[in-house]
């Protein structure tokens, strides 16, 4: 049985125009938990998708400031991970987790 912690680390795959462009370089983009570390992300991707990970780069996108009926609020921060796979490896993100 796969470790349930891995499903908590990887929230969802990112399917955008930019993420399909980086797939040419054997990379895949995921939304990950805000407190997830690079080793945790690497272990989760390797366990869930049965692939070998070469590198993990992370990005924290700060939440935007929004106003609703004069009240100022802020969206949540989002952490993204760009996972570089070893040569010959691939992940089909359209199938889901």
UniProtKB/Swiss-Prot annotation:
GO terms for cellular component: ribonucleoprotein complex; ribosome. GO terms for molecular function: rRNA binding; structural constituent of ribosome. It comes from the Bacteria. InterPro entries: Nucleotide-bd_a/b_plait_sf, Ribosomal_uL23-like, Ribosomal_uL23/eL15/eS24_sf. Keywords: Ribonucleoprotein, Ribosomal protein, RNA-binding, rRNA-binding. GO terms for biological process: translation. Pfam families: Ribosomal_L23. The keyword Chloroplast does not apply. Part of the 50S ribosomal subunit. Contacts protein L29, and trigger factor when it is bound to the ribosome. One of the early assembly proteins it binds 23S rRNA. One of the proteins that surrounds the polypeptide exit tunnel on the outside of the ribosome. Forms the main docking site for trigger factor binding to the ribosome. Belongs to the universal ribosomal protein uL23 family. This is Large ribosomal subunit protein uL23.
């Amino acid at each position: 049985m796969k470790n349930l912690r891995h499903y908590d680390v990887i929230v969802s795959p990112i399917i955008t125009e930019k993420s399909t462009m980086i797939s040419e370089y054997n990379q895949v983009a995921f939304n990950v938990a805000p407190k997830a570390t690079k080793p945790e992300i690497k272990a989760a991707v390797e366990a869930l998708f049965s692939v070998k990970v070469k590198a993990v780069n992370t990005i924290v996108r700060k939440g935007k400031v929004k106003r609703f009926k004069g009240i100022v609020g802020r969206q949540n921060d989002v952490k993204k991970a760009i996972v570089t796979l070893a040569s010959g490896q691939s992940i089909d993100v359209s199938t889901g987790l």
